[in-house]
A protein has these predicted regions:
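The feature marks the mature, well-folded catalytic cores of soluble enzymes
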Residues: 1-182
Length: 182
């Protein structure tokens, strides 16, 4: 296999992979992957499925997913769209196929900013980790960003992403610690 790993996976998985991708460059990475080798895409099956839809390239997908993005459901999205009929829905490719099919745009977090900036709609429903809403509001303040609800609440926050702080980054650079051995 030619193993392509999503950037959000562990350092150990990255070390065993041939190539690392982001949601923003995954399509290009797959397009340039060796044609004579089968691809194993890890660890997010929804992102991998979206990449296959975009590229037409068959891949074997690891059966993993982001616990935040799979909480968005067809039902929760239909409900919020009913409440905001003029709003556009932007979702991250880690969302399930059912949510992606209901979306006006499926794109990486970086591309969400450009899409929001250029959208004719003033109201945008965002189906990704809630931390992105702060950035969108800061970069495109003239738009109204509505958090997409999960089945149970609108609290789609990733505690893993919140573990990284500026202080921890500073300390890591100052002390070269913690060190990870593989």
């Amino acid at each position: 296999y030619y193993v392509i790993a999503y950037i959000n996976c562990s350092a150990h998985v990255k070390a065993l992979s041939d190539c690392i991708c982001t949601s923003g460059n995954a399509v290009k990475i797959v397009e340039f992957a060796p044609k004579d080798r089968p691809i194993l895409f890890v660890p997010d099956q929804n992102l991998g499925s979206w990449v296959m839809e975009r590229t037409g390239r068959k891949m074997d997908l690891w059966q993993g997913s982001c616990y935040v993005h799979v909480e968005y459901t067809r039902e929760s999205i239909l409900k919020i769209r009913e409440e905001h009929p003029d709003a556009e829905l932007i979702s991250h490719p880690e969302c399930t196929y059912a949510v992606r099919m209901l979306s006006d745009e499926v794109c990486s977090t970086e591309k969400m900013i450009d899409y929001a900036r250029n959208s004719n709609s003033n109201d945008l429903i965002i189906a990704t980790e809630n931390g992105m809403l702060h950035r969108l509001k800061k970069e495109v303040p003239e738009k109204n960003f509505i958090p997409a609800p999960t089945q149970n609440c609108a609290c789609s926050e990733c505690h893993f992403m919140k573990m990284n702080t500026l202080e921890k980054l500073r300390d890591c650079l100052d002390n070269l610690d913690p060190q990870i051995e593989m």
